[in-house]
Each structure stands twice: as C-alpha cells, then as structure tokens.
Amino acid sequence: MSLETLMQLKTRQAQRRDECIAAGVLPDPNRPGLLEDAAKLVGTCMDMCPEYERVEREVQKELDRWEVVPGTTHADPTAAVKIYRRPAAGRELPLPEDVRPPAVLEKTLNYLFHTLLPSDPRDPLFAAVQPFLWNRTRAIRQDFIVQSDRGRTAIACHERIARYHILCLHWKGGVGADAWSEQQELEQLRKTLRSLIEYYDDQRLLGHTYPNEAEFRAYNLLLHARDPEALREVELLPCDVFSAPLLQTALHLRTLIQRSNMLEKRGQSRNTESTPNMFTRFFRDVARPDVSYLMACLAENLFSSVRVGALKALSPAYLDRHHGLPLAYVVRMLGMDSEDEASAFLTLVGIEIDSGAAKINRAARINEDQSLPAPFSALVERKRGDASCQAIIDRGLPTHAHMQAAPPPATRRLLSDAAPKAPAPPRAQAPALPHAQAPTPVALPRATPTPPAPAQVPPQPRPAAAQWPPPPPPAEPRRPRVPRCLLYTSPSPRDKR
C-alpha cells in the first residue's frame, strides 16, 4: 500500500466520522450530553483487522511478522489482527467500521488459539507468539468494552483468555522467552478475571447463570489469596456457586497459604492471625487429583512465599548446634523437585548448606526482603498429562484425568519457517526449562473412604401428657456437605441484605 492510499482512507475516515456524529451514532465532542443518552456503539468490521489500521501499519512498518505475506512486507488481510492501543486523552472514539462485533471477535480468538498457538507448550513457537497473543487478546477485550457487550460471547471469550494467561504464567511465557514479564502477565490476568466477575454479577441480575462461574471465582480467589476483599466476595455468592467443589478446593488452599510471619511492608498483604502454617499439607494437597491443572498453576505462583514462611516457622525450633535438616527431607517437605532446586532456594534466602544438610536453626537469618522468582514445578506440570494448549484453553476441565489430547491445529507455513521446532523431550522428563529438574515420581496419597453412618432409630412417640410444651418446629435443612474442604458456610440470606 502507498502513502497516497493511506491519505485517501484518512479523508474518508474524517467524512465518515462527521456522518456518524450527525446520525447520533457517535457523540458530538462539541456538545455536552448525558452518559445515559449516548447511543450504544455496534461494531461493523468483519475482518480481524480494520482496513484503515491495516494500511496505516503497513505504511508505517508496524506490522508483526505473523501478519505479513511470507517473504514480503505487505499485510496479509487473512492474518492481520487489530492491535491494542492504549486509550489516551484527546483520542477520538472509534468508528463502527473500526470495531469488531462479538462474532468476529470470537473468530479472531479462534484464529489466535487454534492457528498461531502450538498444541504443545514446550514448542519454541509458544514463546515466539506469546507477545503477539498477549497484545491481540487485550485488543479483543477492548472491543468488548467499547461496545458495552457483556453477553454470552463476551463471557466465553474472557474465560478462554484467562485460561491462556494462567498457562503462560506457569510456563513463564514459554521455553526461551527471555523478554517475558511476570508482572504484565499477572496484570492482564487480574483485569480479565475482574471483567468476568462483573459480567457474572450483571447476568445474575438478569436471571442468567453460567456453568464456569465457580471455576473462575476459584482462580480469582487464588490470585488474591491474601486479600480479604476477595474472600468477602466469595462469601456473598449464591449457595450453588459457593458449594461447587472447585471453589471449595480454592478456599481450602487459600487457608493453607496464609502466613503470620511475613515481613510487612507498604503495599503488601498483612499477616494473618492464628495461622497454622500447614505448609507440608499445602504442597501435599496441591498434588491431589481434585486440584485442577490451572488451579495448581496459580498456586505455584505462591510456592516461594509459602516456603519462606515455612523456613521462618521452622528456624526457632532448632538450636544452633543442630546438625541441620537433610536436603532430601526439605525437598519432600516443601514440595520441591530436586535437591539442587532446594539447595539453590535455600542459598538464595540465606540458609547455609553443609554436607547435604540445611542449617535451619535459631541463628539463621532468612533474607526475604527480595524478589523471589516463582519456580517452575514439575509437581504442577504432571497434572497436564497429554492435554494440548487448545484442550486446556477451550474446555478447562476440572482435572487432568478428564483431559483428552486435541489434534494439532492447522498451523500456517510461516510459523514453521520463523521458528524451527526443537525435538520434544520424552514425557518422562521434566520440561526443558533451566530451573526445572526431572522429579522422582511421587505416589499421591489415597483418600481413606469414610464408612457410612449408622442408621438412626426413629424416636418412639411419647405419651400424650408429655407433649406439653409443644415440640419445637423442625430444623431448617442443612446445606449439603462438600467433601475434602474446610468448614466454610455461606452467610444466611439475612446477612446478604
């Protein structure tokens, strides 16, 4: 495309904007008005990228390598995807032809996750396309916001985007993603989950419910594990959502994550009083089959904090002359993958290692006033099994046992030319990350079956003389017991007013 074509499109854009303002489709910037009187914007762009943006970015050499015709610098209309642009003061509202309707947004998301994203997260292409997908999924959410769309399609797309961010958080952007930012990934995950929660609340007021609400409420609770406001939101949920096994499991893990010995600083969570510090049980329960793969990925982000809390809780229990704890014991206790990982972590926080033993005692000075990187845990990765990225993102089933491997997506030839595939390591080995070692298979603890309660003999009727005073009214039926969770109860209807 030439500069002349761009100038023609720019002139047509200005004329089209005047027409939309005159027709009331867009608000007049020179005439004040009420927000409730503004017309709802409905997108009419049927391409993944509007024509004007596609030409503009081609002229300005801003096209990504996934958006051009292979071997040229020209935009491919079937591969270009609308870029995210941060809203700025003075920026004009987009025209309807620059905004994609929900059906096109869903089609764009299918293209990103089924054509560009490889099926195996160990594939180098996973890291190669991660920055592109991070930006384009953000633009998809922006188009939903501009149109004030909170319907079924918006919720389904946000759910898939949230699962993708959790997957990237566990894989640290993919193998070899040196420029990946954990802070930026967490920021977009929080915003996606916040939008989802608002959508669920709005739809409930209209009488609509969604089957995946408990799943994403559980993710949000683990993402804000030490935020009391997140717990308050969960306590106000309807009983059917609150009692869902996924949400109850998240509540259980959240209780085990709490600490009472954190170094308190401004902007960080406060300590929790009367914390049991059941760190060993936390890592054991994360390995349970009923903890889903994505839920374990979010819990993994707190492994370092829980391990520091465990060391601070253990230190006062040992005298200075204690010989130390064997590294093999520390590995089992703190859910690590190898003694090398344990040695590196203990050295980082200031624990001395001597003859294969960790000097955890009263004299140890644990250095927690630093940024501890989140580990890549083979304990978590084992839960994925053979599930593909598409199976995890599109279906998000509760446990890895129900996940089936999806066929590899139809990948464009450009992908294989841009990043050569490396041979995948055997499944018995841990993923080829610098900080992940092949773990020794650990047998998961089996749950002991609970024997059935003995049958109760119905009480015999008392004589008529003993019926005064009259018996109390029958008790309100109790809520169904949710197995393997702590004793959480939803507030009564009177407390929800």
Q: Where would I find each of the regions flagged by the language model?
A:
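N-terminal alpha-helical interaction modules that lie
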Residues: 1-150
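Amphipathic alpha-helical repeat scaffolds of TPR domains
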Residues: 106-117, 153-170, 212-222
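Alpha-helical scaffold segments of alpha-solenoid architecture
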Residues: 182-345, 354-355
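Flexible helix-coil transition and linker loops at the boundaries of alpha-helical arrays
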Residues: 142-152, 201-209
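Conserved small/polar residues in nucleotide/adenosyl-binding loops
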Residues: 488-495
